[in-house]
């Protein structure tokens, strides 16, 4: 844990800014994240997340094969989870999904373009269901 903290904590908060297409619009986001680093157990949680990242292909296929409405929402400029790296897999596992791409947003489209995100969520997804 100490090695993880030593090697990652100095830059991890600034790295959070890469989730945004326009990080200049979220001044202080890295400072908020920095506060999390003070909590005992936070490093352990990050390590656990990295170590226990599991393949959810079976679960995703199960959801696709069910009657559950299925949507994916992407920021059009997401550099954390790049759509083009996953689209073939998504097409295979979840071909019936309805996709939405939020303009002018990165990994956190609900924050960067909340108007468009909320319009899709409330006026399309939730209205259909």
Q: Where are the model-predicted features located?
A:
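Catalytic active-site module of serine/aspartate enzymes centered on a nucleophile-bearing elbow/loop
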Residues: 95-129
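Conserved short-loop catalytic and cofactor-binding motifs
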Residues: 30, 34, 74, 105
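A general structural signal for short secondary-structure boundary/capping elements
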Residues: 18-21, 79-83, 116-117, 121
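Conserved alpha/beta-hydrolase catalytic His-Asp/Glu region
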Residues: 3-64
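Conserved serine/cysteine hydrolase catalytic core
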Residues: 42-91, 101
């Amino acid at each position: 844990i100490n090695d993880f903290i030593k090697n990652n904590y100095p830059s991890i908060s600034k790295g959070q800014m890469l989730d945004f297409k326009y990080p200049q619009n979220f001044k202080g986001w890295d400072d908020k994240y920095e506060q999390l680093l003070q909590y005992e157990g936070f490093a352990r949680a990050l390590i656990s997340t990295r170590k226990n990242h599991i393949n959810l292909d079976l679960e995703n296929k199960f959801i696709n094969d069910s009657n559950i409405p299925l949507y994916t929402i992407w920021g059009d400029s997401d550099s954390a989870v790049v759509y083009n790296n996953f689209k073939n897999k998504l097409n295979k596992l979840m071909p019936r999904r309805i996709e939405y791409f939020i303009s002018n947003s990165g990994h956190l489209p609900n924050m960067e373009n909340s108007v468009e995100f909320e319009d899709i969520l409330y006026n399309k997804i939730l209205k259909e269901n």
